[in-house]
UniProtKB/Swiss-Prot annotation:
Domain Radical SAM core: 1-228
Name this protein carries in UniProt: Biotin synthase
Subunit structure comment from the entry: Homodimer.
UniProt keyword S-adenosyl-L-methionine present: yes
Chain positions recorded as [2Fe-2S] cluster binding sites: C61, C96, C154, R221
Cofactor: [4Fe-4S] cluster; [2Fe-2S] cluster
Catalysed reaction equations from the record: (4R,5S)-dethiobiotin + (sulfur carrier)-SH + 2 reduced [2Fe-2S]-[ferredoxin] + 2 S-adenosyl-L-methionine = (sulfur carrier)-H + biotin + 2 5'-deoxyadenosine + 2 L-methionine + 2 oxidized [2Fe-2S]-[ferredoxin]
Lineage: Bacteria, Pseudomonadati, Campylobacterota, Epsilonproteobacteria, Campylobacterales
Record-listed E.C. numbers: 2.8.1.6
Protein's organism: Helicobacter pylori (strain ATCC 700392 / 26695) (Campylobacter pylori)
């Protein structure tokens, strides 16, 4: 039976990001109807970690909005990491806090963070069409810094931004050069507050994207993330094919600003596909 790794997300700082990423409702350039707060209370984060671990999640990603890490964010994430690790839940802790230099990432590593998530999002060529406030090259350098710091690298992208198949290939080729241990695969879902006018990918095209990712990243943990619940809706037959085509990790529960599938029902569905849930991070 195929084993699936479950990962969960905690949006520990939400909204008011000064970047203009066209796909993101957390950008202050778009008037998204989202919750905005500076730092989530530590007790709430610990409750989330315990609850999701009890459901079977092994990965727990602490996400902050904004362009980059700064001293305040570093201290906050380090404090959360130490508190969660003291619980001895056996969680693999991931931080996702934007651009970061080597020293900052080494600080997080020493505080108990195991991996750093920083997505390339799309190809180098297409990126300027979806963001003007920072460059694709900055993203790539942060990924390199994570590896240099001795952290695991989690890096992937978004399909369905009106990019071409060549853009998809270029992104995956760049990801392959980084050898991430995990690659999140997101599917863009149209939102009226966002400037991207793109129709949701069909389930068949989404599956083709997964096959392509598997071809370029045969050894990475391919994690289906945002958009799965919309692209595949109630199409169990095609959703099950995700795992035949190379997906071996799933985001359990909610995303940053959108609802995911109800965790217990999602796990029941995954089990009905003949999958088993991983019990170890390795």
């Amino acid at each position: 039976m195929q084993e699936i790794f479950l990962c969960s997300i905690s949006n520990v700082r939400s909204g008011d990001c000064k970047e203009d990423c066209a796909y993101c409702t957390q950008s202050s350039h778009h008037q998204g109807a989202i919750k905005r707060y500076k730092f989530k209370d530590e007790k709430v984060v610990l409750q989330e970690a315990r609850a999701l671990r009890q459901l079977g999640a092994l990965g727990f990603c602490l996400v902050t909005s904004g362009r980059e890490l700064d001293d305040e964010k570093c201290e906050y994430i380090a404090k959360l990491a130490k508190a969660i690790n003291q619980e001895e839940l056996g969680l693999h802790l991931i931080a996702c806090c934007g651009r970061a230099d080597l020293e900052q990432l080494e600080f997080l590593r020493d505080a108990g963070i195991h991996s750093y998530n920083h997505n390339l999002e799309t190809s180098q060529n297409f990126f300027p069409k979806i963001c003007s406030t920072h460059t694709w090259e900055e993203r790539f350098i942060t990924c390199e810094n994570a590896l240099r710091a001795g952290l695991g690298l989690c890096s992937g992208g978004i399909f369905g931004l009106n990019e071409s198949w060549e853009d998809r290939i270029e992104m995956l080729r760049a990801l392959a050069s980084l050898s991430p241990h995990t690659t999140p695969i997101n599917f863009f879902i149209k939102n009226p507050v966002l400037p991207i006018d793109a129709e949701t990918l069909s389930a068949d095209e989404a599956l083709e994207c997964v096959l392509l990712a598997k071809e370029f990243l045969p050894n990475a943990r391919l994690m289906v993330a945002g958009g799965r619940e919309v692209v595949f809706k109630d199409n169990d037959k095609k959703e099950a094919k995700l795992f035949e085509y190379g997906i071996n990790a799933v985001v359990l529960g909610d995303y940053l600003t959108t609802k995911g599938k109800a965790p217990k029902k999602d796990i029941e569905k995954l089990l009905s596909y003949g999958l088993t849930m991983a019990t170890s991070c390795h």
